[in-house]
Amino acid sequence: MKRMFWCVHHIIIDSDGYYESIKACSSKETAEKIARSISKGETFIRLEEKEI
């Protein structure tokens, strides 16, 4: 079954290479709160369809 989620993408590029983590949230407000709490690297939020 597929559902839509607000996904927080957190990207860090450093001397060790490239790292990306994705956290899926059911609400945009929660995704924005998580994105604001991340201090290192770049973040962006996107609405995506995920298999559950």
Regions found by a protein language model. Give the residues of each.
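Short, mixed-charge low-complexity intrinsically disordered segments
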Residues: 19-20, 32, 37-52
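Short aromatic-glycine-(Arg/Gly/Cys) micro-motifs in beta-strand/loop hairpins
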Residues: 1-20, 43
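Predominantly extracellular/luminal cell-surface or secreted proteins
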Residues: 11, 25, 48-50
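GIY-YIG-like beta-to-alpha core
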Residues: 24-30
